[in-house]
Amino acid sequence: MRQKAFILVALLISIGGGYVFTDWYATIPASAKAKYVGRDTCIKCHQAQADLFHGSHHDKAMDLATDETVLANFDNQTHSAFGVESRFFRDGQKYMVNTEGPDGKLHDYQVKYVFGVEPLQQYMVEFDRTDDMPENEIARLQVLSLCWDTENKKWFHLQPPDVKEKIEPTDPLHWTGRTQCWNTSCADCHSTNLQKNFDLEKLQYHTTYSEIDVSCEACHGPGSQHVELAESWSMFWDRKKGYALAKLKGEDTTAQIETCAKCHSRRGGIQEGFCGGQSFHDFYTNELLTEQTYHDDGQIKDEVYVYGSFLQSKMYHEGIRCTDCHDPHSTKVKFDTNQLCTSCHAHPAGKYDTPNHHRHKDGSTGTKCVECHMPETTYMAVDPRRDHSLRIPRPDLSVQHGTPNACTQCHIDSAKLPAAEQKLLTGKQYLDWLTLAKENKTIDAELKRLDAWAQENVVKWHGTEKQKPHYAEVFHRIRSDSSDTKAYDKLRQMIADKNVADIVRGTAAVEMGRHSEAIQLVINRAFLGAEKELMSPVLKQLQEEVNPMVIQGLLQTAELEITSIVNATWKYEAVDRTGRPNYDGVVVPLTHYVNTLVRLMDHKERVVRIEAARVFLRVPTTVQNRLLDSKQLARHEVVFDELIESVKSNAERGSALLALGSIYQLRVDVSLPERAMVDEARRKKSDKYFDLARQAYRDAIRVAPHESGARGNLAAMNDQLLERYSFEQRKLDVQNNKDDATKFAGLMLKRKKIEEETTKLRKDELKVLGDEARRAIASNVGAGVVDRYAMALYVDGQVDECEKQLATAIQLAPDDPMIVLHYTLILEKQKKFAQALQYADKLLELVPDDPSYKAMRNNLQRQLNQ
């Protein structure tokens, strides 16, 4: 009996064990994709989290315009800005605004959606909606520049900080323009599971989302598989997928931080469909610490949305993550007091949260940790945001390099200024002081006095122990003087130092490209050096670097080096009998670049692969074919397709289509007249990319008719097409062959059509460039735009106006070698040899070893002496 019982128990255990094992072993197929289920499904099990989420900034990120959601006063209110009086009113249940439209005239528009809840609320108008669009699709939404200040309860006009004049309807910055389009610029971060769905052919949006605001699945990922597992009878989560949501709480902080970075970063998209927990670098390219967006020491200047700052911080490198300070569901900080910091910095009593450390009276603003270590900058007129680089105040860097510091910022109200400057700065914040100080010597002197006062007190309190060498010095020096060799050497050291934050190292790599002497040295090595000396410091670092942001920076400078080598074939007279560049002499130096780029095309991060593929296109096709085997060329085609997909994911932007055309154009094999020299397969491939490039430029003109670039590029390609027609016409025997005569006549008709189009393209481009140049001059930025306008004027025969515009460009960017070169050449054209000689000398200061610049300078000297 006992034996039977034992056998029965054993059998039951075996069956039970088998069931348990089977239950554990079963898994969701790897190919199965989770779907979005919505917050109502999540609430069933996660009510506590839902309660915290309700009413949060994520919950209020976007909504329909209703009596419950609209905070502004639409009771027949008016607001005037730059000569335009707008009126806010109701039409039954609809919220309406009468304001300037894309044609420059006043129109009534319905406000359909609201954006945000505090400290401001914005409002959106829908354009281009057709009657046949499904209810769940949204057409083009434009964000009004008229906003509601929720604290002061008033309307205000939101103006870009660097634009002082009225924004015209043709400007992309106008509220009806591209930069204020919700579908392109806002939607991805204000809604869940956004599908942009832009129809390039019809120029229409069919945008959808699963939830209108930033809901649960925006961070945790689509939840259908999680729900399936939670509601199943299984005793286990999935052995491969766990609980089938993004793993945001693991020991590695990367997944959580990069999930937040998707929206809290200054970045560009390279593909759609990011889900929480995925790699940021497979979907986005993060902006480095550029001169336009960050101060030289890495403090925030423009709107950069946290991530780039946090990557610089010691907190990030010590494993701190977003939810250590912020509640992930309410989005609020966990404490409004210094406990937010001291809950981790639990040092002996009296070390930090005491006057012995902060040197301020108890209860004053200066006693708060965040005031010194996370100073605020106000954006969008009323929205103060804290710098997340969490740094020690460094007034010594302010004294040396003009960077901000928390001490001067807090004590700016103690400044002593004459009445004129006081009036100029009324209502301005610290960032405005720093900007105005560059133009106003009185303001600059007062800021320097305050910085020196702050530095004196910091040294008195804490000594100089914390004032260690900082990358601000290096960035400031190379940006002030591109020929500073010592700064260049320090940049090299910085890139190789793994103790330096990766975003700083990546920025250093980009800054190396400023150093004109280093670029010239690359050229000299390519044409004059021995093989063992051919590898540049950038290339050496690129061969061993693993961090995506550092690689991106290195690739930018590597592209400059490759392009400089290729372009220098003309300067060194490396041409063949047809007058085309002969690249045989640069095969060896380019070999190192090609091998490195091919390796990077297998990188795990998409952003690295496509950037390597893009830079690879700078290598001439003939050199590519010589250095790569068929397998490597095939691999490049795969990654090239990834690159094209990435660019096309932003096809609603004229700049993306302009880039697409340039990418296709780089794949055109040879100059078109020498078509007989190319085999049929290569000719067809070249023709395909030639046609694709022209179509991309045409699309760019359709999408962004008020933006420059595409017309000029298309006109240049038309010139190539005309060369092809001329070449084909020369081969025809018109006198003796009737068919040839017919072909000739057909080509003449084609020529006429292309010539007429090209003339119009250049005329329109000149007008658009003129508008852009005027905006750039008014904003005191954009010397490159003014330079391009000047070149277009020259092509149009307006030499005097070209000289005038180049003189302006020189004022905006006195150390830009290309602008200095153009100005020198136009002065020579105008026979102003003495002035031209001065700028030729300036050019040789910037690029000392360039043989063509030396020859130009000598020629100018001869003409002056005649």
Predicted segments — roles?
Residues 651, 705, 779-781, 814, ...:
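Short coil turns that delineate tetratricopeptide repeat
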